[in-house]
A protein has these predicted regions:
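The alpha-helix within a helix-turn-helix
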Residues: 192-193, 467
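A short amphipathic helical element positioned immediately N-terminal to and/or at the very start
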Residues: 17-18, 63-72, 341-350, 478
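Glycine-rich helix-loop "coupling/hinge" segments at transmembrane-helix boundaries
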Residues: 230-254, 338, 503-532, 566-573
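Transmembrane alpha-helical segments of polytopic membrane transport and secretion proteins
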Residues: 1-34, 278-314, 388-393, 554-574
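Membrane-water interface segments at the C-terminal ends of transmembrane alpha-helices
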Residues: 27-58, 74-182, 210-231, 262-278, ...
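Juxtamembrane inter-helical linkers in multi-pass membrane proteins
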Residues: 198, 285-300, 335-349, 473
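Helix-loop-helix hairpin linking two adjacent transmembrane segments in secondary transporters
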Residues: 245-270
Length: 574
């Protein structure tokens, strides 16, 4: 009899579970379609408008590839492509070499002060790329402190662009390479020691090959960042034209939107190629991991440790000199004739380029962090946790990765063509803070999405099945289980979006208005007007806020997560 009751109970419960599952699937499908629709609306269609604009003349008539023919036959414009390529290749090589050595020191040596070196090395992440260019002007400009070190060469041009690009991309390369090198298998090094293999040979046969996919990924990430950057060449490029500045000149200076669209597509192609190669290398990197791998703990080797200590110390000094000079330049009265300190440059007397733009940046960063975190995490949850609609999930996953291949300058210009169209029902968001928030969320969507998906993969998929069998609503499961477990990741995503929204330049350079000017944009325009000290002051304000928010994030994370993540500590103790 007890068994009979149990069977009856199961039979009666099954239809209820089935209905709940069907309802959950329908809701999931609707959300998938909604997210795919949003990507079409705010990514695919704007890029389509950009392509259409490149095939039209100034009157809007279709002229095929005539604009591309003009571009290819214009030596000055075509030369910019090779200039961009040269800058990107040289900057990438230098950055990858320096970052690899630094990451090797952090992960494969016993040198002291690793935490300090890592902290200082990440400082450029908290500043706009233009800050490096401004600092170099003070160091090596026409009235620079170390101008003689350039032995007659000018900092305004490829030398300055490369130096500034290496500075601001260094921490990006360091994070990727540190992760790659930290995955080294200690068993391989133990075998090398047993075979009396030299340190150099072990490096060539174990360390290098083990990190090759990380190096490939870093190479294409840095190449794309430098190739598509606008801020650095705008400030310190001088007469050395690159694709990013050409787009700006064509659109803003000459109002030639068609040629701007053509150059944008030229800028987009290498970025897309780098994106697909990077995705391939990331997948291969995952395939190298083994469940039997042993964490590598480097042995003490005094000669190597001291050499790496000297190298990391030099890099750290250079980073501090750059940020320190930018701050000093913002405080002196009149460089280089009156070096007494003052705060007058923080008054920003130029209308529209002062404190209003700083507050606008904080608003943009706040809105991007709040709305972007919610949208991205929910989208990642749908992709990772929905059990059905594999085809739609695959489409959404592709769209979620696509923004990484689209340079900010290209995305911003495409928004002009699409949302400024009179027949677009969404025309009302053009020239508002809303369009800049949307643009920024889309621009930085991919990294946040991948971060969220990684966290969600750590959760057992049976959580959803158990909640369904207990008739617990999906939203309740999401609120009470998923969010607390993933709270560290959610906070990381929010701070990532906030800092990047504060420092972004290229993504919003075409979208701001007089009332929505941002601090990063104001810094560029102040430099254009010759007010370098005020430009440095504005850039440093961005650094202040980014540092403050980072510290606040660390404090909140430490306090809140101690309560919500107590189960992790108990699990580790057992």
């Amino acid at each position: 009899m007890p068994m009979f009751k149990s069977n009856v109970f199961k039979t009666r419960q099954f239809p209820t579970i089935k209905r709940d599952q069907d309802l959950s699937d329908r809701v999931g499908k609707l959300m998938l379609l909604a997210y795919i629709g949003l990507f079409f609306l705010f990514l695919v269609l704007p890029l389509g408008a950009l392509i259409i604009k490149s095939l039209q003349n100034s009157d809007g008539d279709y002229i095929g590839l005539h604009n591309f023919h003009i571009y290819l036959n214009e030596p000055a414009l075509f030369q910019s492509f090779f200039n961009s390529l040269f800058i990107a290749v040289v900057s990438t090589i230098v950055t990858v070499i320096l970052a690899f050595a630094f990451a090797f020191a952090l992960t494969h040596t016993r040198m002291p002060f690793k935490g300090f070196f890592r902290l200082i090395a990440l400082i450029p992440l908290l500043s706009p790329s233009i800050l490096a260019a401004i600092a170099l002007v003070y160091w090596f400009g026409n009235q620079g402190v170390l101008k003689e070190l350039l032995i007659g060469y000018s900092i305004y041009g490829p030398i300055g662009i490369i130096m500034a690009s290496v500075y601001w991309t260094f921490p990006h390369a360091l994070m990727i390479l540190s992760t790659s090198l930290s995955l080294s298998d200690a068993r391989l090094y133990e075998a090398a020691d047993v075979l009396h293999t030299s340190k150099f040979r072990a490096f060539l046969t174990i360390t290098g090959p083990g990190a090759r996919y990380g190096i490939i990924s870093t190479t294409f990430v840095i190449f794309t960042q430098v190739f598509t950057d606008f801020g650095v060449p705008k400030v310190i490029g001088g007469n050395y034209n690159v694709l990013a500045t050409d787009i700006y000149k064509e659109v803003v200076g000459m109002q030639n939107f068609q040629m701007g669209a053509v150059i944008s597509l030229v800028l987009l192609l290498p970025a897309i190629l780098a994106f697909f190669v990077d995705q391939y290398s990331r997948k291969r990197q995952v395939a190298l991991l083994s469940s039997r791998s042993v964490v590598f703990d480097p042995k003490k080797y005094r000669t190597l440790d001291m050499a790496m200590l000297a190298f990391c110390g030099l890099i750290t000094v250079i980073i501090l000199m750059m940020i320190g000079m930018a701050q000093f330049g913002a405080l002196v009265k009149f460089w280089p004739y009156n070096l007494s300190l003052t705060l007058k440059h923080y008054s920003f007397e130029v209308a529209g380029l002062g404190w209003e733009s700083f507050y606008n940046s904080i608003r943009l960063a706040f809105y991007t962090a709040v709305f972007g975190t919610v949208i991205i995490f929910v989208g990642s949850y749908i992709v990772e946790k929905l059990r059905t609609q594999e085809q739609l999930r695959g489409i959404l996953q592709f769209f979620a990765l696509l923004p990484m291949a689209v340079p900010g300058l290209v995305l911003g210009l495409s928004y002009i063509f699409y949302f400024n169209a009179a027949n677009n029902p969404l025309n009302f968001i053009y020239a508002t803070m809303a369009i800049m928030v949307i643009n920024t969320v889309v621009h930085f969507y991919t990294v946040s999405h991948l971060t969220a998906v990684t966290a969600l993969k750590q959760m057992d998929k049976e959580f959803e099945a158990v909640s369904l069998s207990l008739k617990v609503p999906v939203f309740k499961m999401f609120w009470r289980v998923t969010l607390p477990v993933c709270l560290p990741t959610i906070l990381d995503i929010s701070i990532y979006l906030f800092v990047n929204a504060m420092t972004t330049v290229s993504g919003v350079i075409f979208l701001y208005t007089y009332n929505t000017t941002l601090a990063s944009v104001s810094s560029i325009h102040l430099d254009e007007q010759g007010n370098v000290a005020a430009a440095a002051a504005m850039a440093m304000l961005i650094v202040y806020v980014s540092v403050f928010v980072r510290v606040l994030h660390a404090i909140i994370t430490r306090g809140v997560l101690w309560k919500t993540q107590a189960w992790r500590h108990r699990a580790q103790e057992t």
